Curated annotation (Swiss-Prot):
GO MF annotation: an example: aspartic-type endopeptidase activity
EC number(s) reported in the record: 3.4.23.-
Family as reported in the entry's similarity comment: Belongs to the peptidase A1 family.
Name recorded for this polypeptide: Probable aspartic-type endopeptidase AFUA_3G01220
Composition bias, Low complexity: 32-45
Length: 439
């Protein structure tokens, strides 16, 4: 891949995994306020213990390939266990895992911001997501396609229709199929796509959502009424196969083909933890109209630590989405300005690039995120990220902290910059998240 300085923001969102998608660069002066709401889900179990182990562990690995990001921050551009090998889309942009559907095995993207499990069907129609014109199947860059057999049972009178924030669209049929993930087999409702406008990666054949069932994209054909069903994670815990919890840890030092972390179903990942867990309620943040409603796992934070002082203006009831699909942390703009001004030499925001450009040899100030009474410090390595090459062939770097806009006008995210430093526990049953510093 070749990056000009003008393509930095594309690199942030998709890194080595992007296709020819063309994101609109964030312009601070031209934001449209988002319509959002926040709710706290009801707990239905007691919190799991901080030592809960499980055999259902998915190993994350990294590859260099192309495929766009379906992350929370994509909305800011105003367009949009057992053991299995997982694929990480470069610098924490996304993850994929191996899953058995019927008698076939596929790689699917893991997405904490959606609920559906879907794969593309053989013979599907590929369209350009922008022009909506039919193109060759190879343009969608899917992995192997699903061929339904006798174990797949289509639900008559229902269909699936999905639109992502970056303009991708898919539609197809709904049905049930035997699905095995990390050694656990369930009969699961899935979407089978006949029509796709997709920025693929050449590896994955679909996507697996881990969010709440309210995000399911199934509808009745007669009056287009939403039809809710359990995502695969909920199916597993409602059948008593796992506890209602999943967790994630990322490894910044992973190279291509090596372990980049773990996603664990029903417990904690098999890694060492520094100190104790800090707890905070899960807040479901709903973002309307881009082009559908999006619900994300979100939390409140206590503030941001910078050097020997704290920045309480980062808190005050502001919701931060926990999103492994976003490379950077996105703070309210005044907070991001303060953190980036503390680099030596300072990082400078470039409006065209939508990023703070920083000297690749700069020194980052001590910086941490304060949650649940604890401060989780960011490794300096995660504060300066490669930005490709400029038009003159010079190496460029960008800050791990970006501007998310003014409060009420943007989306704030704790992404890979934060998540590479913690073990993150999504305790859905107790309606809380827990974080501990990773060793």
């Amino acid at each position: 891949m070749h990056f000009s300085i003008g393509s930095l923001f594309l690199y942030l969102i998709a890194s080595a995994s992007c296709t020819a998608a063309s994101p609109q660069y964030i312009q601070r002066s031209r934001r449209t306020p988002f319509t959002t709401s926040t709710s706290k889900p009801s707990a239905f179990t007691n919190p799991s213990t901080d030592t809960a182990t499980t055999p259902y562990v998915l190993e994350l690995t990294k590859i260099n390939n192309k495929g766009n990001a379906r992350s929370a921050v994509e909305l800011n551009s105003q367009v949009r266990s057992g053991s299995a090998n997982l694929v990480s889309f470069a610098e924490g942009v996304g993850f994929a895992t191996s899953i058995n559907i019927g008698n076939q095995t596929f790689e699917v993207v893991i997405d904490t911001g959606s609920s559906d499990l879907w794969v593309v069907r053989d013979g599907f129609i590929c369209i350009d997501p922008v022009s909506r014109k039919e193109v060759a199947q190879s343009e969608c860059r899917f992995g192997p396609a699903y061929a339904p057999n006798t174990t797949f049972h289509e639900v008559v009178g229902e269909f699936v229709d999905i639109k992502y924030a970056d303009g991708e669209i898919l539609s197809g049929v709904i049905g049930t199929e035997n699905v095995t993930l990390a050694g656990i087999t369930v009969n699961q409702t899935i979407g089978v796509m006949d029509y796709a406008g997709w920025y693929g990666d050449g590896v994955t054949s679909g996507l697996m959502g881990l969010a709440y069932s309210s995000l399911a994209s199934a509808y009745t054909t007669n009056n287009r009424q939403p039809r809710l069903y359990n995502p695969i994670f909920a199916t597993m815990y409602e059948q008593g196969l796992i506890d209602p919890i999943f967790s994630m840890v990322m490894n910044r030092n992973a190279s291509n083909g090596t372990a980049a972390g773990y996603l664990t179903l029903g417990g904690l990942p098999p890694v060492d933890i520094n100190g104790n867990f800090s707890t905070t309620p899960i807040l479901i943040t709903n973002i309307k109209g881009y082009p559908k409603d999006y619900d994300f796992y979100a939390v409140n934070i206590d503030g941001v630590a910078l050097g020997n002082r704290s920045l309480p203006e980062a808190a005050g009831g502001i919701q931060y989405i926990i999103d492994s699909g976003t490379t950077l942390n996105y703070y309210p703009t005044p907070v991001a300005d303060s953190v980036n001004a503390a680099f030596i030499p300072p990082a400078v925001y470039n409006d065209y690039d939508g990023a703070y450009v920083v000297d690749c040899n700069a020194t980052a100030s001590v910086h941490g995120v304060m949650i649940g009474g604890s401060t989780f410090y960011i490794n300096p390595t995660d504060m300066i990220l490669p930005g490709g090459m400029d038009n003159s062939g010079n190496k460029t770097c960008i800050s791990g902290i970006n501007a998310g806009g003014d409060v009420g006008q943007g989306i704030f995210v704790l992404g890979g910059t934060f998540l590479r430093n913690v073990v993150a526990v999504f305790d859905v049953g107790a309606a809380e998240m827990r974080f501990a510093a990773s060793a």
